[in-house]
């Protein structure tokens, strides 16, 4: 959608282990911990950071979803703060997380605010979608 801005730290193409080509070409190359946008730019931000640390450097999952960093709790807190910074005063943050290696309850503690609501989905209900209001942060 031309109204959306896709930001990712990666800009790459690779061939996955099953032979498929993966292309990641964001509109903006940037780190979610230090976004290249002015304060109060967006009404809605979707934050879907890499959630896995224990991955091989060339694994399918690392290429497709990205690999988290060793200081992920600090990075996730910084990412949440950046999302709130770029949101307009009544903005909404949609956060997607998979609980395979860290529970969503831990993420909520890291963020320091409860979501307005959430929804579990995916295999074994490990994927969580959460909605946060900037005004509650």
PLM features per residue range, with description:
Residues 1-137:
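Class I S-adenosyl-L-methionine-dependent methyltransferase catalytic core
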